[in-house]
């Protein structure tokens, strides 16, 4: 399902296996638990890198599980359950006292892309993988915190339109040009992870206060943090 490995200052969160890494409630609970574990073990210089195995980073919520509820009402209730249980995952990433990097090994769609965008940096492969917000194609409305995250993280209305209102599957080079990801210069799953580790080690060497880092991060996204119920606290740990 997913694992957390500590390599010195780096925490590596991996969605394991060769499937689509759909977010079933059990998967969501496990991810949240691992983020809480990383937070509890964090020190100055800690970094989180999130990646996955196989063709997909994540293809979003487990819609097949929702549809097995046996009725439209049951399916809607299960979808609502996943939307609400995923909200604390986004909040946990914004509140995490360390820099965060998403290393996209493959396709990131819907809630899978939201997971990626919840990180400070997003790296993508150039040879494989698309970004895709499928809601307009499959007839689902956008949760408020999804929309707020996209507004917070993607700077131009043109880029947001391409991502949310066109149903377009965006490849790496275009995603960089639109300002959705930071880099897409890697030819393999290993390559994108290595690049993320390299950045992580560079950031870890700064030995920043994680609490200050998280406070500054949250101050950048007041609307999103308000929706997520996050408060920004002021920390004073100056290096004199």
UniProtKB/Swiss-Prot annotation:
GO cellular component, one term: peroxisome
UniProt entry tagged with the keyword Lipid metabolism: yes
Subcellular locations according to the entry: Peroxisome
Motif (Microbody targeting signal): 238-240
Major enzyme class: isomerase
Enzyme Commission no: 5.3.3.8
Disruption outcome: Defective in root hair expansion. Mutant plants are resistant to the inhibitory effect of intermediate levels of indole-3-butyric acid (IBA) and 2,4-DB on root elongation.
Keywords: Fatty acid metabolism, Isomerase, Lipid metabolism, Peroxisome
Major subcellular site: other
The keyword Lipid metabolism appears for this protein: yes
Pathway annotation from the record: Lipid metabolism; fatty acid beta-oxidation
Catalytic reaction equation(s): a (3Z)-enoyl-CoA = a 4-saturated (2E)-enoyl-CoA; a (3E)-enoyl-CoA = a 4-saturated (2E)-enoyl-CoA
GO biological process, one term: fatty acid catabolic process
Pfam families: ECH_1 (PF00378)
Residues with site note (Important for catalytic activity): 135
Top-level division of the source organism's lineage: Eukaryota
InterPro entries: ClpP/crotonase-like_dom_sf (IPR029045), Enoyl-CoA_hydra/iso (IPR001753)
Annotated GO MF terms: delta(3)-delta(2)-enoyl-CoA isomerase activity
Record function comment: Able to isomerize both 3-cis and 3-trans double bonds into the 2-trans form in a range of enoyl-CoA species. Essential for the beta oxidation of unsaturated fatty acids. Involved with IBR1 and IBR3 in the peroxisomal beta-oxidation of indole-3-butyric acid (IBA) to form indole-3-acetic acid (IAA), a biologically active auxin.
Family: Belongs to the enoyl-CoA hydratase/isomerase family.
PANTHER family in alphabetical order: ENOYL-COA HYDRATASE-RELATED, ENOYL-COA HYDRATASE_ISOMERASE FAMILY PROTEIN
Listed name of the protein: Enoyl-CoA delta isomerase 2, peroxisomal
The species this protein was found in: Arabidopsis thaliana
Gene name linked to the record: ECI2
